[in-house]
């Protein structure tokens, strides 16, 4: 009988101890809830937001034992991208609460710029570097849709810009030079003029007509030795010795005469 009484007493003590522990745990839970509500009221959060935040923290503690658990533990509730730290964005699924997730890297799918990591932006549903997104609009599309010049029917240089990448830009419409204008070749001058040397430069000079003094070129390429170079005689004329010149003259005079 004494042993039976001892067993009953020990079971009663255990039941009493369990009841005390349950009461203390319930009181501790209520005090934590009150503390969270006080913090949320001071921080300007609504009760729903504080509940979501506590749920997210509990979820992180539950998965804290694995590597995946660590990433889930950092997914804090949010309402916009501004509430997340750098390198994260506010993910809003169709079902479930919003949470801060890791940003999307280059060539990953996206719906907005905020989803992409710093230095990239969302373009056509894919995260691309900012430099590429800036340059892309300036490169014409390679779809062959080019407009013709209404006046001449040719493709304009602007439409063919993607073909001219890396090539020097075409010159502006060339304006022919008049007498005294600088030049590089005779084609730079208007009709009736040639490009001739004048001191250390070349300028447009008039082509010689009949009776005008000319320079007889004895050797090919001797124009380069002249400081004041003359143009050649006009078409149908030739640079010949003047017949009335005196034979005693060492430097015989040449003029443009008919062939």
From Swiss-Prot:
Sequence segments annotated as region (DKK-type Cys-1): 78-127
Post-translational modification: May be proteolytically processed by a furin-like protease.
Subcellular location per the Swiss-Prot or TrEMBL entry: Secreted
Sequence segments annotated as region (Disordered): 42-70
Molecular functions per Gene Ontology: co-receptor binding
A Pfam cross-reference name: Dickkopf_N
GO cellular component, as recorded: extracellular region; extracellular space
Keywords in alphabetical order: Developmental protein, Disulfide bond, Glycoprotein, Secreted, Signal, Wnt signaling pathway
Disulfide bonds: 183-195, 189-204, 194-231, 214-239, 233-256
Main location as per UniProt: secreted
Region annotated DKK-type Cys-2, chain positions: 183-256
Biased composition (Polar residues): 47-57
Glycosylation sites: 52
Recorded superkingdom: Eukaryota
InterPro entries: Dickkopf_N, DIKK1/2/4_C-subdom1, DIKK1/2/4_C-subdom2, DKK1-4, Dkk2_Cys1, Dkk2_Cys2
Annotated signal peptide: 1-33
GO biological process, one term: negative regulation of canonical Wnt signaling pathway
Known function: Antagonizes canonical Wnt signaling by inhibiting LRP5/6 interaction with Wnt and by forming a ternary complex with the transmembrane protein KREMEN that promotes internalization of LRP5/6. DKKs play an important role in vertebrate development, where they locally inhibit Wnt regulated processes such as antero-posterior axial patterning, limb development, somitogenesis and eye formation. In the adult, Dkks are implicated in bone formation and bone disease, cancer and Alzheimer disease.
Family listed: Belongs to the dickkopf family.
Subunit architecture: Interacts with LRP5 and LRP6.
Protein name: Dickkopf-related protein 2
Protein source organism: Mus musculus
């Amino acid at each position: 009988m004494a042993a039976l009484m001892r067993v009953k007493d020990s079971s009663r003590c255990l039941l009493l101890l369990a009841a005390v522990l349950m009461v203390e745990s319930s009181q501790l839970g209520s005090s934590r809830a009150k503390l969270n509500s006080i913090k949320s009221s001071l921080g300007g959060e609504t009760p729903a937001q504080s509940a979501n935040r506590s749920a997210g923290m509990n979820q992180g503690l539950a998965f804290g034992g694995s590597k995946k658990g660590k990433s889930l533990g950092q997914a804090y509730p949010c309402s916009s991208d501004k509430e997340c730290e750098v390198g994260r964005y506010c993910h809003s699924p169709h079902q479930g609460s919003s949470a801060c997730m890791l940003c999307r890297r280059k060539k990953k799918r996206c719906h907005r710029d905020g989803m992409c990591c710093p230095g990239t932006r969302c373009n056509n549903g894919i995260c691309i570097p900012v430099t590429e997104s800036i340059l892309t609009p300036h490169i014409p599309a390679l779809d062959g849709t080019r407009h013709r010049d209404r006046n001449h029917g040719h493709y304009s240089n602007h439409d063919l810009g993607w073909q001219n990448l890396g090539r020097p830009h075409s010159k502006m419409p060339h304006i022919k030079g008049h007498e005294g204008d600088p030049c590089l070749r005779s084609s730079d001058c208007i009709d009736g003029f040639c490009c001739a040397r004048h001191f250390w430069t070349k300028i447009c000079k008039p082509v010689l007509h009949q009776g005008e003094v000319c320079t007889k070129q004895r050797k090919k390429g001797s124009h380069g030795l002249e400081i004041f170079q003359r143009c050649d005689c006009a078409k149908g004329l030739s640079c010949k010795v003047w017949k009335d010149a005196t034979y005693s003259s060492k430097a015989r005079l040449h003029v443009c005469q008919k062939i």
